[in-house]
Structure formats: C-alpha cells, structure tokens
Regions:
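Terminal-region recognition feature
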Residues: 1-147
Length: 147
C-alpha cells in the first residue's frame, strides 16, 4: 500500500510529503493513512537548527489530528529551533490549510489552491441537545482555527 506521506532527510532538511487525508488514530484502516504518531516519529529525528519542509497536497481530514500536529510542530520550533518551510504543491484544503500557518515561509504555486472554510460536521439521529453541543464544538473549532 502507498502511504500518503513520505519522509526524506538530507543535509539537515527533513521533507514531509502530505499527499492525502489527515486521519485520526481511531480511523486508521491501512498504511495509506497517517496519524499524529507518524509525524512525531519524523520530528523526533530532527536536530537543533534543522529545517522541516512540508509539501502539501491534501483535502484535509481530522481537525483534532491536524491540531495535534500543529502543536507538535510549534513545540519542535521552540525546543529544537527548527525552521519550517511549507509548499502547497496542489491543494491545501480544510484542516490541511492549518499546516502552512505554522511555517516560517509559505510557497503557493500559481496552479495551487489554499482553501480555508468554517468547520463542518454532520449529525444523524440527533436531538436538539446533540445539535446544540455540536454547534458549540464547531464554534470552538472556528476560534482555534483562527489562532
């Protein structure tokens, strides 16, 4: 199975190719999915002053997994003084648009798209209390996404 991400290291540069959906740990069905732990393993190998290059072509995915990745990258920037460079190779949509927001440099090609939207969800068989809880969660996620 082909992974949607690929990690390459060369001369103090670690490249992470995010080409597919960002999946929560409980949703991982096969090796093509990636979780927070997959990114943690890559960033744990980086040394002080290294550069992380993120190549993004993703429709998004799990907002909570993405937020965990964003927080981990921010922590690594502070503790290891890494530089983060982001390239939107094709599509950086939905929560995948959060990843370049933590970069020191962002490159978007003329043929690429960065799509930011309000958080979305779906409910089935929900009552008014369930819907109100979901509204509150979506409002919180929107505030988090603005940070």
């Amino acid at each position: 199975m082909k992974k949607f991400y690929n990690i390459k290291s060369q001369n103090n540069i670690t490249g992470i190719y995010i080409y597919g959906e960002i999946i929560g740990g409980s949703d991982k069905w096969d090796e093509s999915d990636v979780t927070f732990d997959d990114f943690k393993k890559a960033l744990d190998t980086m040394n002080n002053g290294d550069t992380l290059e993120m190549y993004i072509n993703s429709p998004g995915g799990s907002v909570f997994t993405t937020q965990g990745i964003v927080n981990m990258i921010n922590r690594c920037k502070k503790t290891k003084n890494i530089k983060v460079v982001s390239y939107i190779d094709g599509l950086g949509a939905s929560c995948a648009s959060w990843l370049p927001m933590v970069a020191d440099e962002v490159y978007v090609y003329n043929t690429s798209m960065l799509m930011v939207h309000k958080p979305m969800s779906s409910l089935f068989g929900a009552n008014a209390n369930d819907m109100q809880s979901e509204i509150e969660l979506l409002n919180k996620l929107e505030i988090i996404g603005r940070r």
